[in-house]
Amino acid sequence: MKDKPAKGTPTLPATSMNVQNAILGLRGRDLISTLRNVSRQSLRHPLHTAHHLLALGGQLGRVILGDTPLQPNPRDPRFSDPTWSQNPFYRRGLQAYLAWQKQTRLWIEESHLDDDDRARAHFLFNLINDALAPSNSLLNPLAVKELFNSGGQSLVRGVAHLLDDLRHNDGLPRQVDERAFEVGGNLAATAGAVVFRNELLELIQYKPMSEKQHARPLLVVPPQINKFYIFDLSSTNSFVQYMLKNGLQVFMVSWRNPDPRHREWGLSSYVQALEEALNACRSISGNRDPNLMGACAGGLTMAALQGHLQAKHQLRRVRSATYLVSLLDSKFESPASLFADEQTIEAAKRRSYQRGVLDGAEVARIFAWMRPNDLIWNYWVNNYLLGKTPPAFDILYWNADSTRLPAALHGDLLDFFKLNPLTHPAGLEVCGTPIDLQKVELDSFTVAGSNDHITPWDAVYRSALLLGGDRRFVLANSGHIQSIINPPGNPKAYYLANPKLSSDPRAWLHDAKRSEGSWWPLWLEWITARSGPLKAPRSELGNATYPPLGPAPGTYVLTR
């Protein structure tokens, strides 16, 4: 694998919406308040507004005369059809849209708004401009062609899809054909057994898929916001099967999908439940110090467990930790507090406690509005304008299979983003013990995504710096989920690595080397060096203390 200098990768993420905003929620009143603020600025500074209106008028005049001063992003698939550039009507319509988009962006950028209000205005007008894109109308050339080719049936199917989504999907277009998948059938289908269950989780032990296995097991901690089978999708995308085929012992946590009865489950509850799963893993494997892997909020829970064990002088029960797109340092370089203030945070806590849970569908909606062109308008065109069935992608099915968060954990996560407690010793207390991550002297391997809009890579990088021990950091050229599900064989995949961790993410990036392909083989080399000798695997799952309770994927994952 040839190393190349890292080039063309942004030094900082460009998003202003992230996981903090997703769990906080997005209220209509906040958007209306932003619109009012923009209107006030327009009235207070009429010369500024007039300047941009004149500029817009001049550009529209050039468009009417047939000039094409603006070009869409060549990577924007919305306008890839040749009709947008070859047909005079469509070309002028696209140019007018691009001119409007440019001037609204410049008006906001050059306004007297402060940084936070400017970020809110950009977010609001990005939503508006994305919605107003001419590709979202029935005049979309692809929709017109499909209408004629189908004899009008595409419109009939599109209206049927729209009515169904209004009734059954909260008015958002479906992203996936759910009929194509079944949990335990063609998803989460790797053979194994539930070997431990408590009120919050089930522990799955997988059957070996190699002639020999390493002695030290790996315990995987998925995020609580979604279900565990992000690690066990279809066979070609299954991280679990990749690990098993390469000789690793794998245990998997499957979190229970809580309901209002479980509103008091907080971070300490999850850490305590995870510690019980760790004990079961140690007992069944006969190994005193398993390796751990955590993703997103699962990584936060895993770090809290390690800090808890360290405070009890029991950190020897863990050998190493792998963090996948996990935030431990919740400070963002971009304006992360987009619509977050003390009043909004407390209102979000009260709302979820009254309901008992934060509905996963609500979180999914916010995530969708973070990337509306990819996650909303793309499917608007496909499902409604073209009248097509949404695609059958395993990752999209998993994404739609959302879970709830208990109110107490929701409140703990909001406080985590508000207070950033892990950046100083004893800033966070879990299960009655203060947490100091610098004292967690374990080998760690951290993965972030350069295009991650949920957990920005520079914040994940700073999170790695909070840990003690020997640390590795890898930056994949993917988004949040694709940074985890990164199987070998993707010709577009690459990652950046630099063994020297600087205090500044930009400095690390400047000296990082680019390697083609997936980061999985690099991590496999790292983890196998910490997984003990190879030995013949046991033929039976569980043991006398923890007998099998049922086949994988268990029962908790099936709860909607």
From Swiss-Prot:
| Keyword tags | Acyltransferase, PHA biosynthesis, PHB biosynthesis, Transferase
Q: Name one Pfam family in it.
A: PhaC_N
Q: Which GO terms describe its biological process?
A: poly(3-hydroxyalkanoate) biosynthetic process; poly-hydroxybutyrate biosynthetic process
What's the top EC group for this one? Answer: transferase
E.C. number: 2.3.1.-
Establish whether keyword Flavoprotein is in the entry.
no
Active site: residue positions? 296
Which Gene3D superfamilies does the UniProt record give?
alpha/beta hydrolase (3.40.50.1820)
- Annotated metabolic or biological route of this protein: Biopolymer metabolism; poly-(R)-3-hydroxybutanoate biosynthesis
Give one GO molecular function term: acyltransferase activity
Q: Which InterPro entries match?
A: AB_hydrolase_fold, PHA/PHB_synthase, PHA_synth_II, PhaC_N
Family that this chain belongs to: Belongs to the PHA/PHB synthase family. Type II PhaC subfamily.
Function as written in the Swiss-Prot or TrEMBL entry:
Synthesizes poly(3-hydroxyalkanoates) (PHA), complements a mutant of P.putida that does not make PHA.
- Supply any other comment: P.oleovorans accumulates poly(3-hydroxyalkanoates) after growth on medium chain length hydrocarbons. Large amounts of this polyester are synthesized when cells are grown under nitrogen-limiting conditions. When nitrogen is resupplied in the medium, the accumulated PHA is degraded.
Protein name (record): Poly(3-hydroxyalkanoate) polymerase 2
Q: Which organism is it from?
A: Ectopseudomonas oleovorans (Pseudomonas oleovorans)
